[in-house]
């Protein structure tokens, strides 16, 4: 830095950068207001900057321009978008029409005649808006309950035995090992005879 007459030159605009407005990145100096993505002009900081040669980008634009090409452009599920990067000079590939490979309705009758699957508990038709799959079978949301206590279940909290679904507590009491505690842990010890 010169002793008199200002500071280093900004890597973006070329003007003098004084200490109070200085941002340093990759050995270069920038004005705070010039430390912007080369494409979208977003303000950058040390956690959002990505450098390519002498150019600075936000991580999103850098990924679109230099990252792997494909669904989501490698940014993670939280930032998926439909921007194909045309303004970066990226030529979009011609889109192929989507053709589903399988019908999500597994019932052969339903596939052939357009009907709905039957609920494993009540036997009535289960339509997509109210369908839950548990133990590999369709259920109404209201029927997706423990067969013993009636507690609502989730696909991660159920256990299945002989085609019926149970909460973990009822399953342990009715089908688990018999004896001290019924297999529920020390907090629920009960002596069985």
Swiss-Prot record:
Signal peptide: none annotated. Keywords: Acetylation, Developmental protein, Differentiation, Isopeptide bond, LIM domain, Metal-binding, Nucleus, Repeat, Ubl conjugation, Zinc. One of its GO terms (cellular component) is Z disc. There is a cross-link at residue 91 (Glycyl lysine isopeptide (Lys-Gly) (interchain with G-Cter in SUMO2)). The modification N6-acetyllysine is found at residues 112, 131, 137, 161. Residues 10-61, 119-170 form the LIM zinc-binding domain. SMART domains: LIM (SM00132). GO terms for molecular function: actinin binding; metal ion binding; structural constituent of muscle. The modification N6-succinyllysine is found at residue 137. Its main location: nucleus. Interacts with KAT14. The LIM domain 1 is necessary and sufficient for this interaction. Interacts with GLRX3. This is Cysteine and glycine-rich protein 2. The lineage of its organism: Eukaryota, Metazoa, Chordata, Craniata, Vertebrata. The gene is Csrp2.
């Amino acid at each position: 830095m010169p002793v008199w007459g200002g500071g280093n030159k900004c890597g973006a605009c070329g003007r003098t950068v004084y200490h109070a407005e200085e941002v340093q990145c990759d050995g270069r100096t920038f004005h705070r207001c010039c430390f912007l993505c080369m494409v979208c002009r977003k303000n950058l900081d040390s956690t959002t900057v990505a450098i390519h040669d002498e150019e600075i980008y936000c991580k999103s634009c850098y990924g679109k321009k230099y990252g792997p090409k494909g669904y989501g452009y490698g940014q993670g599920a939280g930032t998926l978008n439909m921007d194909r990067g045309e303004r970066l000079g990226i030529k979009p590939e011609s889109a192929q029409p989507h053709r589903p490979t399988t019908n999500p309705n597994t019932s052969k009758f339903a596939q052939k005649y357009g009907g709905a699957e039957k609920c494993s508990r009540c036997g009535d038709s289960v339509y997509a808006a109210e369908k839950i799959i548990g133990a590999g079978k369709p259920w109404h949301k209201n029927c997706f309950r423990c067969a013993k206590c009636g507690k609502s279940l989730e696909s991660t909290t159920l256990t299945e035995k002989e085609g019926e679904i149970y909460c973990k507590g009822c399953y342990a009491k009715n089908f688990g090992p018999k004896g001290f505690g019924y297999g529920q842990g020390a907090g629920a010890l009960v002596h069985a005879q």
